[in-house]
């Protein structure tokens, strides 16, 4: 009977490897395998609902996520050397990169694949429709236009990817 029992953590590891393997077959190995093998460490406040939804978005997209509840993320950004003007409600670290705000998982994968000389990615201002900020009720499916910024080592930024607005559906 014991040999039929698989620990929950072992099941998760097997599932991650299977997902990474399927992704590697269809997308190439570099970005999917790297993302599945890396752990994203997230600092957020314990009561922030959108942070929890963003973490779920990352997990759904194959990332291993460790969360740390803090009263304020400002000190973490400062410790990581990430410019405060890009600050949002949560801060994450993945390898050498900082991820700030509601950055989509696909953009994190592209960052890992391209490996630019940069501090990381940021989505300031918590735009409606970004991962973790999906609207509900009358705002379901609505997205404000927003940019994912590549924050360079000198503290400047450039647009990494732009997302167009999706207006509300008129009934």
Language model features: what each stretch is:
Residues 1-13, 17-27:
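N-terminal secretory signal peptides
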Residues 33-37:
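Boundary at the C-terminal end of the N-terminal hydrophobic targeting segment
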Residues 38-53:
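Local sequence-structure signature of Cys/Sec-based thiol-disulfide redox active-site neighborhoods
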Residues 47, 54, 69-72, 104-108:
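Stable alpha-helical elements in mature extracytoplasmic
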Residues 56-67:
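Conserved helix-turn-beta segment immediately C-terminal to the redox Cys motif
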Residues 65-76, 86, 94:
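Thiol-based oxidoreductase modules, predominantly thioredoxin-like and allied folds used
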Residues 85-169:
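Thiol/selenol-based redox catalytic cores and closely related redox-interacting motifs
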């Amino acid at each position: 009977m014991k040999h039929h029992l698989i620990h929950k953590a072992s099941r998760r590891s097997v599932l991650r490897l299977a997902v990474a393997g399927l992704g590697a077959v269809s997308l190439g190995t570099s970005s999917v395998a790297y993302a599945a093998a890396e752990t994203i460490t997230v600092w957020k406040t314990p009561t922030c609902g959108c942070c929890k939804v963003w973490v779920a978005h990352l997990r759904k997209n194959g990332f291993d996520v460790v969360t740390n509840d803090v009263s304020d993320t400002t000190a973490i950004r400062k410790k990581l050397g990430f410019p405060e003007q890009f600050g949002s409600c949560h801060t994450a670290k993945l390898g050498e990169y900082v991820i700030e705000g509601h950055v989509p998982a696909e953009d994190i994968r592209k960052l890992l694949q391209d490996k630019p000389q940069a501090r990381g990615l940021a989505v300031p201002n918590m735009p409606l429709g970004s991962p973790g900020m999906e609207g509900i009720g009358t705002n379901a499916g609505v997205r404000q236009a927003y940019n994912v910024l590549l924050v360079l080592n000198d503290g400047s930024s450039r647009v990494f990817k732009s997302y167009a607005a999706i207006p509300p559906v008129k009934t």
